[in-house]
């Protein structure tokens, strides 16, 4: 009965919001934006509620036909078959769909994301793998019509990336990419390997929700900002002005270096954006750890030390170890960014775990 009351309350809330938005003259701009956001979030849930209520009415009508002594035998039989289909098959499905829609949303899912990739163990091979992953996510962003804006790239000079970061803007970026955080491992024969021996190397991926200054404030007194001349591969100076910026967050010791832009002001803004995202993610992880004491997630917490996926080139195979999903479409995934098979499976597993945790 509680669920029925909740559905009625949601429906009433939605109708009230709809009425307010139809007469926006009484609303401030801030109120209008807030209500519009609520409306767009509630609309898909209301659609499922309407489907659920319609189905219940149809089931009730069929019950009446089955009970009616004046109904003909053939009509009763048809009603019985339809009742079974709707009551035993469709109703449980729509109830599950409704429960999922009513689960509390991750407030960060609608945010843009900052992608950070660092070469791990494996020397130059790891750096080449890091560059490959960076391009893979860039391709995936293109497939989804997201904007992919590189923030910083530290080249090795021969095609590899020691580390690289990018800001990804678009719809549900963090929601779809958040399970990519962790250690990605590659197994392949390097082009420089004359004996044909298989090498294993790794790169670390971090997906951070982008946060604006109004959402997460950093105290000026907690920052040390150093400026210096930017340098390229091998350490040679590539700029004649002090445009490179190093921002140190004193309480945590986190350091962000930004030197890709020629303007010191732009480098500082980018460095602060990355720092804000990293600090926000630390807070996020704390909250997630508190929640995970009640609900152990099988697909991982986004811990960057957790090995999540292996890319095996000789066998053209990619395996996600959290959900035991293997694909032999390595080339399409790496070169074309066809990641949806893994991303959809991870989202589905997470939803199933959340539903199980609520029951």
UniProtKB/Swiss-Prot annotation:
GO terms for molecular function: translation release factor activity, codon specific. It comes from the Bacteria. Keywords: Cytoplasm, Methylation, Protein biosynthesis. The keyword Nucleus does not apply. The modification N5-methylglutamine is found at residue 236. Residues 286-305 are annotated as: Disordered. Transmembrane segments: none annotated. GO terms for cellular component: cytoplasm. Methylated by PrmC. Methylation increases the termination efficiency of RF1. PANTHER family: LD18447P. Peptide chain release factor 1 directs the termination of translation in response to the peptide chain termination codons UAG and UAA. NCBIfam families: prfA, PRK00591.1. This is Peptide chain release factor 1. It comes from Wolbachia pipientis wMel.
């Amino acid at each position: 009965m509680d669920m029925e009351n909740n559905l009625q309350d949601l429906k009433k809330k939605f109708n009230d919001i709809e009425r307010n938005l139809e007469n926006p003259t009484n609303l401030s701009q801030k109120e209008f934006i807030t209500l519009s956001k609520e409306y767009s979030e509630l609309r898909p849930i209301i659609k499922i509620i309407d489907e659920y209520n319609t189905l219940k009415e149809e089931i009730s009508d069929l019950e009446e036909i089955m009970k009616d002594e004046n109904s003909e035998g053939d009509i009763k039989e048809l009603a019985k078959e339809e009742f079974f289909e709707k009551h035993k098959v469709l109703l449980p499905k729509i109830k599950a769909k409704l429960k999922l829609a009513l689960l509390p949303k991750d407030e960060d899912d609608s945010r843009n994301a900052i992608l950070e990739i660092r070469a791990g163990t494996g020397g130059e091979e790891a750096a080449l793998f890091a560059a490959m992953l960076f391009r893979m996510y860039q391709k995936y962003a293109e497939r989804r019509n997201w904007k992919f804006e590189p923030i910083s790239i530290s080249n090795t000079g021969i095609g590899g990336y020691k580390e690289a970061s990018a800001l990804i803007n678009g719809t549900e970026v963090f929601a779809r990419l958040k399970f990519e955080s962790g250690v990605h491992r590659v197994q392949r024969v390097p082009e420089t390997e004359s004996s044909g021996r298989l090498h294993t190397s790794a790169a670390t991926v971090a997906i951070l929700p982008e946060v604006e200054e109004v959402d997460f404030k950093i105290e000026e007194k907690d920052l040390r900002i150093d400026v210096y001349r930017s340098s390229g591969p091998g350490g040679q100076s590539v700029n004649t002005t002090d445009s490179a910026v190093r921002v140190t967050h004193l309480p945590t010791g986190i350091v962000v270096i930004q030197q890709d832009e020629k303007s010191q002001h732009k480098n500082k803004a980018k460095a602060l954006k990355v720092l804000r995202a990293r600090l926000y993610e630390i807070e996020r992880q704390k909250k997630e750890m508190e929640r995970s004491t009640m609900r152990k997630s099988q697909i991982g917490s986004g811990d960057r030390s957790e090995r999540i996926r292996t890319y095996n080139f000789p066998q053209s195979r990619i395996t996600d170890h959290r959900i035991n999903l293997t694909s032999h479409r390595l080339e399409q995934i790496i070169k074309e960014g066809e990641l949806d098979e893994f991303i959809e499976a991870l989202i589905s597993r997470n939803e199933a775990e959340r539903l199980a945790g609520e029951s």
